[in-house]
Amino acid sequence: MKEIIEKLAKFENLSGVEMTDVIERIVTGRVTEAQIASLLLALKMKGETPEERTAIAQVMRGHAQHIPTEIHDAMDNCGTGGDKSFSFNISTTAAFVLAGGGIHMAKHGNRSISSKSGSADVLEALGINLDLKPAELGKVFDKTGIVFLFAKNMHPAMKYIMPARLELGIPTIMNLTGPLIHPMALETQLLGISRPELLESTAQVLKNMGRKRAIVVAGPEGLDEAGLNGTTKIALLENGEISLSSFTPEDLGMEGYAMEDIRGGNAQENAEILLSVLKNEASPFLETTVLNAGLGFYANGKIDSIKEGVALARQVIARGKALEKLRLLQEYQK
């Protein structure tokens, strides 16, 4: 382990084999907490390569829980977090809109690390049981078309990494890895990151992980979602090719809002915001959700443009389909 950390300290990249070996040792309890923290910091300072990120994701997925389900076209819209925007739970709210629009949403998430409320926190406040067994979660998914997978329970091997990660208190390769290690073999994905310089390389990792179609999004002001406060950049993975583009609210015929307009609060406050959006109450929260759900529909390939996706998201919410999915999840995942 010492040799690996010294190599990273010299800003030398690890091979896929080296990274695989290191992570296997970590997730089987053979590395100290201090060494793990040093590794995470060294990788962050050097800059993580697609090969390193693919290797860690493949190892972590190999140690994840298996969710038995009859659904084979699941999608997720989990972001990396770590943007310190203190926004409401955008992707979690948008997940219900996507599910209401007919997409099988397997929402993967965790408790907050750098904000007041993570996806697990807000859903727990809404009565969702975070601790169902994998077989029970599979049944929920089959019955409702939506399920929440609590990352802590899905990845028992993460217990070896979490103490060092929490102690550091800064975004590391594990933030970048979280959305990549979904327990299910996803076909499509919308993945938010707070570092736009990693758009293309993250799309490359998704390609390496077998995604058929995906979008990696980096919003304005470091937001790890699409934003109405400036220019949003995306990388689209389609037919094995990656293309980069950007858009503004004006491009989509939408009104702009400042970052402070979408500030959230604690889990209970964010739960109330989520409900207000699904009830179609006009606000910057609603508009931001519509934007991100629209981008999700486009990432899934359900429609042909982000603008069409935004229109579909509005219809789904207005018809009560998104709220209906929340009620179903509350009924079955309890």
UniProtKB/Swiss-Prot annotation:
One of its GO terms (cellular component) is cytosol. GO terms for molecular function: anthranilate phosphoribosyltransferase activity; magnesium ion binding. Binds 2 magnesium ions per monomer. Its EC number is 2.4.2.18. Pathway: Amino-acid biosynthesis; L-tryptophan biosynthesis; L-tryptophan from chorismate: step 2/5. 5-phospho-alpha-D-ribose 1-diphosphate binds at residues 79, 82-83, 87, 89-92, 107-115, 119. Anthranilate 2 binds at residue 165. Mg(2+) 1 binds at residues 91, 225. Homodimer. PANTHER family: ANTHRANILATE PHOSPHORIBOSYLTRANSFERASE (PTHR43285:SF2). Catalyzes the transfer of the phosphoribosyl group of 5-phosphorylribose-1-pyrophosphate (PRPP) to anthranilate to yield N-(5'-phosphoribosyl)-anthranilate (PRA). This is Anthranilate phosphoribosyltransferase. It comes from Streptococcus pneumoniae serotype 4 (strain ATCC BAA-334 / TIGR4).
